[in-house]
């Protein structure tokens, strides 16, 4: 997994893959859009949004 731009449905799909059964806390206010869509984010950064 290399750092990627993830926006919209791609971002949600990536969170489902990374978090699995834990689920995730998704809110645009958390900065995930800025981190992963405007810039790039890593698998490790995505894991920060898992429950």
Curated annotation (Swiss-Prot):
Cysteine disulfide partners in this protein: 7-37, 19-50, 36-41
Keyword flag Disulfide bond: yes
Q: Which residues form a coiled coil?
A: none
Say which domain of life the source belongs to.
Answer: Eukaryota
A single Gene Ontology biological process assigned to it is: glucose homeostasis
Q: What keywords were assigned to this record?
A: Carbohydrate metabolism, Disulfide bond, Glucose metabolism, Hormone, Secreted
Query: Any one cellular component term from GO for this entry?
Result: extracellular space
Main localisation, per the record? secreted
Q: Where in the cell is it found?
A: Secreted
PROSITE patterns, alphabetized: INSULIN
Record SUPFAM superfamilies: Insulin-like
Q: Which GO terms describe its molecular function?
A: hormone activity
Q: What does this protein's UniProt record list under function?
A: Insulin decreases blood glucose concentration. It increases cell permeability to monosaccharides, amino acids and fatty acids. It accelerates glycolysis, the pentose phosphate cycle, and glycogen synthesis in liver.
- Subunit text: Heterodimer of a B chain and an A chain linked by two disulfide bonds.
Family under the similarity heading: Belongs to the insulin family.
What is the name listed in the Swiss-Prot or TrEMBL entry for this protein?
Answer: Insulin
UniProt source species: Balaenoptera borealis
Lineage here is:
Eukaryota, Metazoa, Chordata, Craniata, Vertebrata
């Amino acid at each position: 997994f290399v750092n990627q731009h993830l926006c919209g449905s791609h971002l949600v799909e990536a969170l489902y893959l990374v978090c699995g059964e834990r689920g995730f806390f998704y809110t645009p206010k958390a900065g995930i859009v800025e981190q992963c869509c405007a810039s790039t984010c890593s698998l490790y950064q995505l894991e920060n949004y898992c429950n």
